[in-house]
Amino acid sequence: MKTVEILFWIGLFIVFYTYVGYGIILFLLVKIKEIFSKNENNKGVRDLPEVTLLIAAYNEESVVDSKMTNCLELDYPTELLKIVWVTDGSDDNTNTLLANYQRADVLFEPARGGKTAAVNRAMDYIKSPIVVLTDANTYLNKEAIMEIVTLFNDPKVGCVAGEKRVLSKDKDTASAGGEGLYWMYESKLKDLDSRLYSAVGAAGELYAVRRELYKHMEKSVLLDDFIQSMQIAMR
């Protein structure tokens, strides 16, 4: 066999493994593990902890009202759910609109230092044991907070990643549909990763951490969600 043919088949194998093979092997490993492991169900009703929903936003006036409506509809005791916005550098009507909502705590500094710096600063203010981080243009299922909290019943869990679903509009159904399929597959892989040992990263649209495990990151960090979740998984 010629060198070119060998390289071709090696390259083809790498592509196949990356997009399909890894998922197949992961699925088989999870099934083998579950056959020989005890099924521990940590879900159930326990004393609910105080939770802070943290939203880092910059000039998000177009979604403030819809986001707050979504937050206020979440199925979690009002007295245990704090809603904190950090809006550093915003110079539109974001802060003005948020002032209309009594439950919205707003942290604001005129200078914009980036999302990572804003989240770091907000974490110094937050005291609740569980912090759920989400984007201003991300809308949560009503049960999302409750589902996340139940996973923290397991003391070995330090970070929980949410599942992203893309909502499509008529004008871009094809492109959004393709993105939606990608995220469905990505979410399935993360689910299998967590069942085998641990997921290898969380999407910034929705993830939660134990406050005590959060570590400040350098302002220059761009993938703050990935870095933070990986640091927790490594402990």
Region annotations inferred by a language model:
Residues T52, N70, V86-N95, A111-R112, ...:
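A conserved acidic beta->alpha catalytic loop
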Residues M1-K43:
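N-terminal membrane-anchoring/stem segments of glycan-assembly enzymes
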Residues T69-L80:
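Short, acidic, metal-binding catalytic loop of nucleotide-sugar glycosyltransferases
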Residues S62-S66, L80, D92-N100, E143:
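Acidic helix N-cap motif at the loop->helix transition within catalytic regions
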Residues P49-T52, K82, I227:
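Cell-envelope/extracellular polymer assembly enzymes that use nucleotide-activated donors
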